[in-house]
Amino acid sequence: MNSQPLRVGIGGPVGSGKTALTLALCRALRGRYELAVVTNDIYTQEDAEFLVRNEALAPERIIGVETGGCPHTAIREDASINLEAVERLNRRFPGLDLILVESGGDNLSATFSPELSDLTLYVIDVSAGDKLPRKGGPGICKSDLLVINKIDLAPLVGASLEVMERDARKMRGERPFVFSNQKTGQGLETIVAFIEKQGMLGVA
């Protein structure tokens, strides 16, 4: 049993698919690990309620945080509200292996405080255009794993996955990225394997 759970931050712009990815990760990992979730919304607990409605986990394993302001601040400059939620979950479930921390919708400059997140996933979506990876920013360039989501929309919005792949490689260097489609589950296996390997889940 880990003394402290692995904390995985999931960030990205509004509508990129963070909550859908969080739901998919819960479904994929809950049978193997002790798991909990913290979600961030500015004025509501909508994402937490979505996860509860879709039975991602038992309701008591999901805490919705209302940041009441810039979502970036709550995960970076003043992460105290999220750290308190993580601590509450640790007290409630002493044997936790993994806590997913989903940020509110944010911009390309958002990053997680290292106090809050051990690994960061940054989710962008194809419908924002194939130029998005080359716009850079900490999420695109520095996250541990970049998730390029909603690839099924590429032909509908005239986006080139080849261009996105080229620019992601250019902006990220050796850091990995993955194409994903949460509707079909494409890419999920790769994301799960990344979390398990990089987070050393299951290693005594």
From Swiss-Prot:
Keyword Cytoplasm: yes
Keywords, comma-separated and alphabetical: Chaperone, Cytoplasm, GTP-binding, Nickel insertion, Nucleotide-binding
Coiled coil, from the record: none
Pfam families per the UniProt record, alphabetical: cobW
InterPro entries: CobW/HypB/UreG_nucleotide-bd (IPR003495), P-loop_NTPase (IPR027417), UreG (IPR004400)
Main location: cytoplasm
GO molecular function, one term: GTPase activity
Subcellular localization(s) per the UniProt record: Cytoplasm
CDD domains given in the database record: UreG
Gene Ontology biological-process annotations: urea catabolic process
Summary of subunit composition and partner proteins: Homodimer. UreD, UreF and UreG form a complex that acts as a GTP-hydrolysis-dependent molecular chaperone, activating the urease apoprotein by helping to assemble the nickel containing metallocenter of UreC. The UreE protein probably delivers the nickel.
Annotated family: Belongs to the SIMIBI class G3E GTPase family. UreG subfamily.
Protein name per its UniProtKB record: Urease accessory protein UreG
